[in-house]
């Protein structure tokens, strides 16, 4: 969904976002000065030296902070070569891996806490807030201070510009409303003031809202993505408390989420100082030399960008983000067709492929595979029709219809929307590249948040005995707990 943070969603339009921002700055910042200084009939006349100096200083600060917000590297994790090559060692108990981390399939590397894979930057971004199309860059651990300064100086310049504009609108138009038209401002001046007023109002409103939401997130220590995750978690809890067990309706687990507090809120001052990279508040809003936090790649898994202080409100560390029961349910049901091994009997030995078969045997095998594919497609269609029938029955239930209008059913990260209609995909997160809560390193099962299932509390992890996808590990865990042998 298009909004202030995510920008236009139409393919190809985002490449024009930065030129559009530059054009808007030039129009409001420099065309306005040209109009005010050349329209002698527009009271109270040209800008004074003091007004020009203040306005142009604000514009210089705006340009500097915008350039930094666009060009500063959002950060990149660098793992030791041995750690990346010896990935299976980390997947065993006793490996050198972190206490808890996700695994990025595209980067083929662990994903530290609060990091996400950006589909625009094509890498995992430390403490990713969102990908901003207006800067063409990710708002992250390293770029957030520059982004915040840009918003502050932009709003300051707009407020001062409003003073200059409305002074001329009052004295040049309203105060002379009874004067004959030929003695008032020219048509060009009137048209210019009208366009400037419209552009100023739209820009001031949008950027003031963006500044307020950004400052709020800054003080709470949350990123936009984490606010989205927190809202989804609250929605899941609300459905659970109301007895609306969406996940147990199909008999695949009956997940009941356990409340998880946001662990990275350590107080207003600590949150703000951590985000700006220094406790010296005098440097926070310097357009040059203000700096910001830098990721510590010299000591992987330790230092800035790799670990974050928690407030201790949860039973264990590393419980954020809360698990997505819908995603776990699909994986426990067989990974939704993601991995063929989930539907295979792994204990059955497969005959070796005979590469010297005749052409007739190959044709027969090909036709057999076609029949199997057709049968699987028919089963999927049948399953889909059964779901449609269930939904049709639920729609006849007035109570369910009323509940569905107030809360959206939880879906995967791409489809679930918050109250503003945003998904993780809108924030730039490549949701398809995230393995579910499970870089299976040392002690992972002890640090993951528990999820209540039909068979008890589970951390969503399977046995860590082989280097297999997490969905398969979860499936084996379910089979083992239910005593079902394939």
Curated annotation (Swiss-Prot):
Its main location: endoplasmic reticulum. Residues 102-152 form the DHHC domain. The active site is at residue 132. Residues 386-399 have a biased composition (Acidic residues). GO terms for molecular function: protein-cysteine S-palmitoyltransferase activity. Residues 81-91, 324-333, 346-376 have a biased composition (Basic and acidic residues). InterPro entries: Palmitoyltrfase_DHHC (IPR001594), PFA4 (IPR033682), PFA4/ZDH16/20/ERF2-like (IPR039859). Residues 37-51, 167-178 are lumenal. Keywords: Acyltransferase, Endoplasmic reticulum, Lipoprotein, Membrane, Palmitate, Transferase, Transmembrane, Transmembrane helix. Its EC number is 2.3.1.225. It is found in: Endoplasmic reticulum membrane. The keyword rRNA-binding does not apply. It is a multi-pass membrane protein. The chain crosses the membrane at residues 16-36, 52-72, 147-166, 179-201. Residues 81-101, 314-420 are annotated as: Disordered. GO terms for biological process: protein targeting to membrane. One of its GO terms (cellular component) is endoplasmic reticulum membrane. It catalyses: L-cysteinyl-[protein] + hexadecanoyl-CoA = S-hexadecanoyl-L-cysteinyl-[protein] + CoA. Residues 1-15, 73-146, 202-486 are cytoplasmic. It holds the Pfam family DHHC. The DHHC domain is required for palmitoyltransferase activity. Belongs to the DHHC palmitoyltransferase family. PFA4 subfamily. Mediates the reversible addition of palmitate to target proteins, thereby regulating their membrane association and biological function. This is Palmitoyltransferase pfa4. It comes from Neurospora crassa (strain ATCC 24698 / 74-OR23-1A / CBS 708.71 / DSM 1257 / FGSC 987). The lineage of its organism: Eukaryota, Fungi, Dikarya, Ascomycota, Pezizomycotina.
